[in-house]
Amino acid sequence: MSDNDKTVTITQVRSVIGCTQKQKATIQALGLGRPNYSVVKPDNACTRGQIRVVQHLVKIEEN
């Protein structure tokens, strides 16, 4: 399996109420918006950087 085939499933587990604008914008950029929403994204440096910003709000599953 090459690096291009790897994906991560990102599930929002906490609300963005009380979060900074940067964290709210990152959640929107990931395609999330409400708790228990999930998206599948490619596993690359860009996605990992976005996950790091909101790591306390999301759950990650590597595929």
UniProtKB/Swiss-Prot annotation:
Pfam families tied to this protein: Ribosomal_L30
Biological-process GO terms, alphabetical? translation
Sorted keywords for this record are: Ribonucleoprotein, Ribosomal protein
GO CC, sorted alphabetically, is: cytosolic large ribosomal subunit
Judging by the UniProt lineage, the source's domain of life is Bacteria
Its Gene Ontology molecular function terms?
Answer: structural constituent of ribosome
Checking PANTHER family in the record gives: LARGE RIBOSOMAL SUBUNIT PROTEIN UL30M (PTHR15892:SF2), MITOCHONDRIAL RIBOSOMAL PROTEIN L30 (PTHR15892)
Its family remark reads: Belongs to the universal ribosomal protein uL30 family.
Q: How does it assemble?
A: Part of the 50S ribosomal subunit.
The molecule here is called Large ribosomal subunit protein uL30
Gene source species: Chlorobium chlorochromatii (strain CaD3)
